[in-house]
Amino acid sequence: MTKDILILAVETSCDETSVSVIKNGRDILSNTVLSQIESHKRFGGVVPEVASRHHVEGITTTINEALVDADVSMEDIDAIAVTEGPGLIGALLIGVNAAKALAFAYDKPLIPVHHIAGHIYANHIEEPLTFPLIALIVSGGHTELVYMKDHLTFEVIGETRDDAVGEAYDKVARTIGLNYPGGPQVDRLAAEGEDTYSFPRVWLDKDSYDFSFSGLKSAVINQLHNQRQKNIPIIEANVATSFQNSVVEVLTFKAIQACKEYGVQRLIVAGGVASNKGLRQSLADQCKVNDIQLTIPSPKLCTDNAAMIGVAGHYLYQQGRFADLALNGHSNIDLEEYSAE
């Protein structure tokens, strides 16, 4: 009988302290998430120093809760997986040092995990990954298209040249007057409005899978500034709808085109913006038309969580990709360099 593999995973790359226990690469035995949204809301965004302090305060309790919820002890754990980057360096160091302490104290292998690899593997929890596939990464810090021909092989075929899509959402939300976090509020507001503005769709070079959202963001900001200067009423829902349609159209088109060019019949979506209802519907419609299998995690698995780190960690464990106690956090790590090849 094959022994179950239990991975204890730690995620502290931004403003969630999360610890999870994953069995055999798919089964979530626990997934404890300590959110800091209320602490950062008054600042209109994540404050790195505040995030780090909250991680320090919560990491030990979160580890203990995850073990209790999973009904396991550290002796049952086979390895410790931890996000080493990218992310806020102060926040990352809390999780990395906690994971190193556990690995040392209990003599367990230590597995460094790329944060974006974790988001990709969140899809595997609900529907096993099949290859080849295209992954659309949409989050506050990243917007990428990634081709994968097997587990842990990452070829970045497109990425943002300026703002990440989630960053653009938050800045537009602030301009409209919405509270942090702005992305979900723009999405909700977009469902109520009409596409009355001619905001740009930025396609860049012909056949390019890169993205650019700074021009769109600036167009929205300038439009609202001009209307306020002239005392022209602003219909916030229409701004949200027009902005979101511009974003979603470009993301959907490039993701579908990538699937066609690479001969792929599987598209997965990863990152916090993957919970956006407008994007989910657009991708679902176009994937149906083009006979492409679409997988998007449940909203609770789109945001930062340790379960996704544990799933990616399971496959790294199988490949024997361990780190020693000199492991450090890194604010930037290239996904392709992290690839198995």
Curated annotation (Swiss-Prot):
EC number: 2.3.1.234
Binding site for Fe cation: H115, H119, D304
Cofactor(s) required, per the database record: Fe(2+)
Pfam family for this entry, one: TsaD
Subcellular location: Cytoplasm
CC terms in the record's Gene Ontology section: cytoplasm
UniProt cross-references to SUPFAM superfamilies, sorted A to Z: Actin-like ATPase domain
Gene Ontology biological-process entries: tRNA threonylcarbamoyladenosine modification
Catalytic activity entry: L-threonylcarbamoyladenylate + adenosine(37) in tRNA = N(6)-L-threonylcarbamoyladenosine(37) in tRNA + AMP + H(+)
InterPro entries the record matches: ATPase_NBD (IPR043129), Gcp-like_dom (IPR000905), KAE1/TsaD (IPR017861), Peptidase_M22_CS (IPR017860), TsaD (IPR022450)
Chief location: cytoplasm
Binding site for substrate: I137, V138, S139, G140, G141, D170, G183, D187, N276
Family assignment from sequence similarity: Belongs to the KAE1 / TsaD family.
Free-text function comment from the UniProt entry: Required for the formation of a threonylcarbamoyl group on adenosine at position 37 (t(6)A37) in tRNAs that read codons beginning with adenine. Is involved in the transfer of the threonylcarbamoyl moiety of threonylcarbamoyl-AMP (TC-AMP) to the N6 group of A37, together with TsaE and TsaB. TsaD likely plays a direct catalytic role in this reaction.
The protein's name: tRNA N6-adenosine threonylcarbamoyltransferase
